[in-house]
Amino acid sequence: MLIISPSSEIAQSFLDNLDTNLNVYSISRRNFFHKSIKKNYIINSSDNLSNNKLRRYFGSIKFSYFISFIGDQKIEKKSLNEIKNKKILQIFNTNSIFPVKIVYCLINNNNFKAAAKIIFFSSRSGSITERGTKKHHSKKGNNIYRASKALLNSFVKNLAFQNKNTKKIIIAYDPGWVMTKSSGGGNISLSKSTKDLSLIIKKIGKKHSGKFLNNKFYEIKW
């Protein structure tokens, strides 16, 4: 298993309850240790990724599972026109481009097992169809975060389409409003979130590839 952003609260709760017989590797922007992680690789979202660079890290390792936990919501205190383009691109790169590019490189390097399950943490806030249709999604602000998740969803949909003739399962996943320090509230405990994710990993099959699923296994409109 390979995970990105192991330091997030949801990731740490997941790791705390993970089967210890599973070899877990992680990618983060700083040193990180967890008893369940065999090795952590420091790779920043600003790094120039390439097939060769990741080949030097992972060699011939083949992963059965990949989970990108990148998904912390950053509340924008300024209006869109007040935020510098450099900052906007940084958020897009971290939330959207970076995790997908990692997967593209790993696929090119044959670092996934044939029926690997690849999960990208996204957010319902990134649903274009649902924007403004529900109380939570009718709130103003946080435009860049929402747009970054919409971009991620588009990447995931395309990635799944490009791998439709393989056994790989690729989904976008909304864990719901989990009670973490960064969420500012929530209605799902960390322990419940861990159980939800474990069930998703266990149950998803090829028929789910290319879909945007929530923690109750319902499909969210793009």
Predicted regions and their residues:
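Short-chain dehydrogenase/reductase
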Residues: 15, 55, 103, 156, ...
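N-terminal Rossmann NAD(P)H-binding glycine-rich loop of SDR-like oxidoreductase domains
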Residues: 2-20
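Short, polar loop motifs at secondary-structure junctions
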Residues: 6-9, 25-33
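Catalytic loop of short-chain dehydrogenase/reductase
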Residues: 72-102, 107, 115-164
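Rossmann-fold cofactor-recognition segment
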Residues: 29-50
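C-terminal helical subdomain
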Residues: 168, 172-173, 184-222
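Rossmann-fold scaffold of SDR-type NAD(P)-dependent oxidoreductases
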Residues: 3-4, 62-73, 95, 120-122, ...
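Flexible, glycine-rich beta-alpha linker
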Residues: 126-128, 155, 160-188
